[in-house]
């Protein structure tokens, strides 16, 4: 006869696989959203740079021309943050339901008061706990700011080196042939991917912690 501990270990392994697959799906959806807004973002960046020739280039003029790009960029990451928030709210409801039925499903009765928190309370607890030293909201704003700085600095360097607008945009965004993975901002995409995966694991861990408190 399989012991309770063995069943719990089996459940933990199976659930870890499920969490990894779910996290991969969330990453794909978030990056697909980012890809859609990037198309508009870089079209606007190209249009802005066309109006800035090398002879009239100044940091002040560049900042003025990038204002609309910066606004669109911030809105893009706001969309990303909202989409991830919605994903995590739906996920925490399912994860909390799983945690509540886990012990009874392997023959361990719940004591009075165990698991009485609501999914919304678990979500609030997860959002109030930092992971890797920051809250989720701070991660989103941090990535957005770093990415915009990277774009601005790359444009400055491009003008100093007399690159064309197309060369500058291609160097920053990457090439379609490589799936845009060869651009300077690829590091920010990988950073966003890591944050999304960690956020899913973080929420799952908080749900488990609340269950055994």
Whereabouts are the PLM-identified features?
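Acidic, glycine-rich two-metal-ion catalytic cores of nucleic acid-processing enzymes
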Residues: 183-213
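N-terminal leader/targeting and assembly helices and adjacent pre-domain segments
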Residues: 1-182
